[in-house]
Amino acid sequence: MDRTIKYQITEEADGLRIEQFLRHQGYSYQNITQLKKMPESILKNGVWEYMRSLLATGDILTVHIQENESSPNIPPVELPLSIIYEDEDILVVNKPAGMPIHPSLNNYENSLANGLMWYYTEQGKPFIFRCTNRLDRDTSGLTVIAKHLISSSILSSMGARHEIKREYLAIVRGSVTPPSGTIDAPLARTGSSMIERKVDFKHGERAVTHYKVVEEKNGHSLVSLILETGRTHQIRVHMQYLGFPLVGDYLYNPDMEYIHRQALHSWKLSFIHPITREPMEFTAELPKDMKNILI
């Protein structure tokens, strides 16, 4: 996928080398190496330049990203997609429950990656699948996809610095006590399982979840959760640890009376745009299967 980004050089960047300026914009060393291999990827005032060239106030720096290949081993499959937002750099999707993010041995043609590969193949565009905030197969809600190597790198760095804010909604049985708080409990694998996690204060990695009850209806509580860290199954294990596991969670609480998947939805996503640096915020309402529990 091709993308052209232009920067007007201000006094603050006067005298910097091009590579220094790009590093200040969030480009990684790997990004700069990748750009060097692309033909005419760096132009200053319309003329090709080396990365070590100096910039002056008023210069126009043009970065031309050229990615002509698609992700291998992701067959394009026409699948329903709820695209909330799209521009030249990112894509925000409201993923349904039951759809994996990536293809796997048992889910080779029903993943979000398959659907997006079809979406771009139909447009005649190459596409490399780069998902920034991954969701479990049975967790619904918002996820952001980077459309090229620069936005991917910047979003990944933002995620590592906890600058991508995610808020979830979950449903549990009963009245949660206390109704708000912070769960600070490290997580580790359960035995030899590659999937299941548990609270483990001796061997676990630090995990922090902030929660607050939003409403109580029909014997259940709707809980808002904000992640400070992003461990595997963090919300699911932390709520179990609190004594209020998510309903429908086959792994940690197989309570399938009202729903047949964990009642967990990524409803709000906010971050600074990786290229324009504008604040972005997206929301996705609670899906019907979760709403029905509260009726």
Give short role names for the model-derived ranges.
Residues 1-180, 188-191, 289-293:
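RNA pseudouridine synthases
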Residues 83, 172, 210-213, 246:
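Conserved hydrophobic positions within beta-strands
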Residues 84-85, 136, 188, 212-215, ...:
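Well-ordered beta-strand positions
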